[in-house]
Amino acid sequence: MAKGGAKKAAAAAARAAANRMLADNRQARHQYEILETLETGIELVGTEVKSIRNGKANLRDGFCLIRNGELQLHNVHISPHSHAGAYFNHDPLRTRKLLAHRREIDKLRGQLDQKGLALIPLNIHLKGSWIKLTIGLGKGRKLHDKRAAEKEKQSKKEVKAAIARF
């Protein structure tokens, strides 16, 4: 009986490790109102994969563009791998191609034509053995919108704390 429980726990741990978060852009949800998300693949070289798996990616200043019918990721810093020589390492800020279906790219292009919308990288995570990037279609928030969202978040937190006391 204990043996079966150990197998289930090991399987659950393996699933959690196969779907873990590698990098997160927490600032994006503060600066943008995310209207829609899309999970895409990302074209990487070997040293980039090793660095991302070690958690050495920074999405904060990143953005996505559609050029020549392809999704591209710009300004995302992936640190050079520590155990690779200078010759074999990658450029930390290079433009990376994102992998998505043509109809998804066309849909995003149509939505981006609206004023004030942008494609923002939200997080990098593992899905099985594949590294995936979640991008969000976001509308920039004004300062008063950010304040209102912060007040709403604070009030929800206070209500939850009050309920927990009783």
Curated annotation (Swiss-Prot):
InterPro entries linked to this entry: SmpB (IPR023620), SsrA-bd_prot (IPR000037), SsrA-bd_prot_CS (IPR020081)
Swiss-Prot/TrEMBL keywords: Cytoplasm, RNA-binding
GO biological process: trans-translation
Bridged cysteine pairs (disulfide): none
Subcellular location: Cytoplasm
Gene Ontology cellular component annotations, sorted alphabetically: cytosol
Coiled-coil intervals: none
Record keyword Ribonucleoprotein present: no
Matches recorded under Pfam families: SmpB
Single GO MF annotation: RNA binding
Entry function: Required for rescue of stalled ribosomes mediated by trans-translation. Binds to transfer-messenger RNA (tmRNA), required for stable association of tmRNA with ribosomes. tmRNA and SmpB together mimic tRNA shape, replacing the anticodon stem-loop with SmpB. tmRNA is encoded by the ssrA gene; the 2 termini fold to resemble tRNA(Ala) and it encodes a 'tag peptide', a short internal open reading frame. During trans-translation Ala-aminoacylated tmRNA acts like a tRNA, entering the A-site of stalled ribosomes, displacing the stalled mRNA.
Family affiliation: Belongs to the SmpB family.
Protein name: SsrA-binding protein
Phylogenetic placement of the source organism: Bacteria, Bacillati, Cyanobacteriota, Cyanophyceae, Synechococcales
